[in-house]
Amino acid sequence: MKIGIVGAMKQEVEILANLMRNQTVTQVAGCTIYEGLINGKQVALLQSGIGKVAAAIGTTALLQLAKPDVVLNTGSAGGVADGLKVGDIVISTETAYHDADVTAFGYAKGQLPACPATFISDEKLTALAKQVAQAQGHNVKRGLICSGDSFIAGGERLAQIKADFPNVTAVEMEAAAIAQVCHVFRVPFVVVRAISDAGDGQAGMSFEEFLPIAAKQSSAMIIGMLEQL
């Protein structure tokens, strides 16, 4: 099995890249794909860049060039669900775009034409992620992760997301785009992210301060999952 891993930022992939043996590096369409072995497992690791379009371009390149059997999305997220704090783990059961709206034509909020209302994560990968999180002693929540091309820092924007998606667990900027590409290519996926901020008025400062913690926690989760894939 070849395992695809997607992260947006250098900080979100460098721990994994530094663990990789027999590494080859491919630069394509503004993205970087590292291929090699991590703890004996065949891995293709993508640094996509930030945002939905970058994530979609990178994930498409990853699937076309490296042809992984599954995709794991790693990185950081803003916690929305009650009880989440910096370093906690969120696992997707489904993803949606919080900034897509074609409801005038009868679609659900966040749904794009020719797409499902949400992109459902692979049940086996979701269960494995929860198992690994519990084994590593993390506080973990599974649920809906919402994506959009905005860094959410509280205020009206966060309030609107909560109103549109009452069961939202976390927000970030790539997961739904990655999920949509995996849906089209019929590749199983799951999103596993560590909380870097609370999506509130202090989110910008919190993100800068706690991104290294989130990157370490999410990378540890991926390493734990690799051991069992």
From Swiss-Prot:
Sorted UniProt keywords: Amino-acid biosynthesis, Hydrolase, Methionine biosynthesis
Gene: mtnN
This enzyme's EC code(s): 3.2.2.9
CC per GO annotation: cytosol
Catalytic activity: S-adenosyl-L-homocysteine + H2O = S-(5-deoxy-D-ribos-5-yl)-L-homocysteine + adenine; S-methyl-5'-thioadenosine + H2O = 5-(methylsulfanyl)-D-ribose + adenine; 5'-deoxyadenosine + H2O = 5-deoxy-D-ribose + adenine
HAMAP family xref list: Salvage_MtnN
Example of a GO MF term: adenosylhomocysteine nucleosidase activity
Lineage top rank: taxon: Bacteria
An annotated GO BP: nucleoside catabolic process
Stretches assigned to coiled coil: none
SUPFAM superfamilies: Purine and uridine phosphorylases (SSF53167)
Function: Catalyzes the irreversible cleavage of the glycosidic bond in both 5'-methylthioadenosine (MTA) and S-adenosylhomocysteine (SAH/AdoHcy) to adenine and the corresponding thioribose, 5'-methylthioribose and S-ribosylhomocysteine, respectively. Also cleaves 5'-deoxyadenosine, a toxic by-product of radical S-adenosylmethionine (SAM) enzymes, into 5-deoxyribose and adenine.
Active site: E12, D197
Cross-referenced InterPro entries: MTA_SAH_Nsdase, Nucleoside_phosphorylase_d, Nucleoside_phosphorylase_sf
Metabolic or biological pathway, per its Swiss-Prot or TrEMBL entry: Amino-acid biosynthesis; L-methionine biosynthesis via salvage pathway; S-methyl-5-thio-alpha-D-ribose 1-phosphate from S-methyl-5'-thioadenosine (hydrolase route): step 1/2
Name of this protein: 5'-methylthioadenosine/S-adenosylhomocysteine nucleosidase
The species this protein was found in: Mannheimia succiniciproducens (strain KCTC 0769BP / MBEL55E)
Residues involved in substrate binding: G78, I152, M173, E174
Protein family: Belongs to the PNP/UDP phosphorylase family. MtnN subfamily.
